[in-house]
Swiss-Prot record:
It catalyses: glyoxylate + acetyl-CoA + H2O = (S)-malate + CoA + H(+). This is Malate synthase. It is found in: Cytoplasm. The keyword tRNA-binding does not apply. It comes from Streptomyces arenae. It comes from the Bacteria. Pathway: Carbohydrate metabolism; glyoxylate cycle; (S)-malate from isocitrate: step 2/2. The lineage of its organism: Bacteria, Bacillati, Actinomycetota, Actinomycetes, Kitasatosporales.
Length: 543
């Protein structure tokens, strides 16, 4: 006797949205329920204690090493991943949220890959979750346009040449409060909601277009989590009746533990892997999260100094070079970091910023990366030129980087950054965190702050540095010490005058700065480090 059909998940505490019936069908919700409850609940539940155990061991020993039990996988030169021809050229990938305007602009940008991101640049309101899925389906059927109510400007798709979409679901650690088990017992994991709805509605549609269901996998911490993803892919392909090996996934190496298991992660996903991405900012955030603030060698310097010098330090060069070597030795794509600059009306500002973007992309191309990220369409030709100038072909997977030799200690050598922490920048860290969270609580996940397109990673690194500096007792350049006092006074007086001038008095007064301030201060001053700022923020998010 065949197993009974799974019951679909129930929608709770959510106002009806236009066209939600196209996405939240009984069949799609039954697929998500099957993924979550009947197949992978135990594996997902077991992953949390494993993460906690690993974190405690790192805190105890203040070190990490490559796994001895997987040495055979690393030593075996015979295996490769099965990267598809459809993702052979990834020289420039544009990332952004799944709203209609960004969807159209990304597909019109000329980038080789569009990364439709449900995670960091998207505040997880129910409207963003559901209508993001609607927008992607409309894009793939070329049934999408948008008119900006404020400016009257109309956006429409131009004839598309070579483009490949890749979806970025939210992480395993998050629950979706609006979709629950039929008995109301617990909520669905957001990652299963994002992946499940997208895959169910678009896998066959994308194959019919000569593309495929491609994904970015965030917040992966170990090869065991990669194994879980592989099991999900196998089940999902069988469920909807498409061939095994159709799915392709790029894993973000944005946690310190994953950096020590890059080859093992590729091995577990070898039938579905297309590459790894060097998530530089989240990598640093993960170091703060895992290593004791009482150890001076792990204290990160000023964020602005780090922004300028980060990619040139021996520490980060070893991380990115290790990524490049690992990717290309296994025939997978090596994708570099984000260029987050937003073009300004000031030509001189643009000139300086474009040169920094060009230098960063030149370095990545010369280091062996096959492509890189940008956040704005105007940066696509700049990044493309860097990779075209370095090598005149779709990728450089044949460049094995046999010159790269990385020791375990190199990947956590934060003290090699050799930079100072400045008191003024500590205030900037607080302001950036508050400005981002204020927008996030209004449903915006991607925000322009100081000429950069910032997302959740910005808020995480900002509040992490505040927490770390206070707990480490950092002294700033003039001898002032980091204490709990300065985050609390960050909203007072002249420091917010530029924001008032930028927004105007009425819009500034209309926004809920106090809630954002209180939340950033709370997670910055808590004795125990909160795993993710967005977890307590989600409790305050409306919608």
């Amino acid at each position: 006797m065949s197993a009974p059909a799974p019951s679909p998940l129930a929608i709770v505490d959510a106002e009806p949205l236009p066209r939600q019936e196209e996405v939240l069908t009984d069949a799609a919700l039954a697929f998500v329920a099957e993924l979550l409850h009947r197949r992978f609940t135990r594996a997902v539940t077991n992953s949390s204690p494993r993460r906690a155990d690993a974190a405690r061991e790192i805190a105890r020993t203040s070190t990490l090493d490559f796994l001895p039990e997987t040495a055979a996988v690393r030593a075996d030169d015979s295996w490769r991943v099965a990267g598809p021809a459809a993702l052979n050229d990834r020289r420039v990938e544009i990332t952004g949220p799944t709203d209609r305007k960004m969807t159209i602009n990304a597909l019109n940008s000329g980038a080789k890959v569009w990364l439709a991101d449900f995670e960091e640049p998207s505040a997880p309101t129910w409207e963003n979750v559901v209508l993001g899925q609607v927008n992607l389906s409309d894009a793939y059927t070329r049934n999408i346009d948008f008119t900006d109510e404020r400016t009257g400007k109309t956006y429409a798709l131009r004839p598309l040449k070579s483009w490949r979409p890749s979806s970025w679901p939210r992480g395993w650690h998050l629950n979706e409060r609006h979709l629950v088990d039929p008995d109301g017992s617990f909520g669905a994991r957001r990652v299963v909601v994002d992946f499940g709805l997208y895959f169910f509605h678009n896998a066959q549609r994308l194959l019919d277009l000569g593309k495929g269901p491609y994904f970015y996998l965030p917040k992966t911490e170990s090869h065991l989590e990669a194994r879980l993803w592989n099991d999900v892919f196998v089940f999902a392909q069988d469920y909807v009746g498409i061939p095994q090996g159709t799915v392709r996934a790029t894993v973000l190496i944005e946690t310190i533990t994953a950096a020590y298991e890059m080859e093992e992660i590729l091995y577990e996903l070898r039938d579905h892997a297309s590459g790894l991405n060097a998530g530089r900012w989240d990598y640093l955030f993960s170091i703060v999260k895992n290593f004791p603030a009482t150890r001076p060698k792990f204290v990160l310097p000023d964020r602005n100094v780090t922004m300028t010098k980060l990619t040139m330090t021996a520490f980060m060069r070893r991380y990115t070079n290790c990524s490049s070597y690992c990717h290309n030795a296994r025939a997978s794509a090596a994708i570099g970091g984000m260029a987050a600059f937003i073009p300004s009306r000031d030509a001189e500002v643009n000139k300086v910023a474009f040169e920094k973007v060009r230098a960063d992309k030149d370095r990545e191309a010369n280091d062996g990366f096959d492509g890189s990220w940008v956040a704005h369409p105007d940066l696509v030709p700049i990044a493309m030129e860097s990779f075209d100038r370095c090598w005149h072909r779709p990728n450089q997977k044949d460049r094995l980087r046999e010159d790269v030799h990385v020791e375990a200690a190199d990947l956590i050598a934060v003290d090699s950054l050799e930079a100072t922490t400045y008191a003024g920048s500590s205030s900037t860290a607080v302001q950036v965190g508050i400005r981002y969270i204020e927008a996030w609580l209004r449903g915006l996940g991607r925000v322009a702050i100081f000429n950069l397109m910032e997302d959740a990673a910005t808020a995480e690194i900002s509040r992490s540095q505040i927490w770390q500096w206070i707990n480490a007792g950092v002294e700033f350049e003039h001898g002032e010490k980091a204490t709990p006092i300065w985050p609390r006074k960050s909203r007072r007086g002249r420091k917010w005058r530029p924001v008032r001038e930028e927004l105007g008095e009425e819009p500034f007064a209309a926004r809920d700065w106090q809630h954002a301030h209180d939340l950033v201060v709370q997670v910055s001053l808590d004795e125990d480090y909160a795993d993710f700022l967005t977890l307590p923020a989600y409790e305050r998010l409306r919608g």
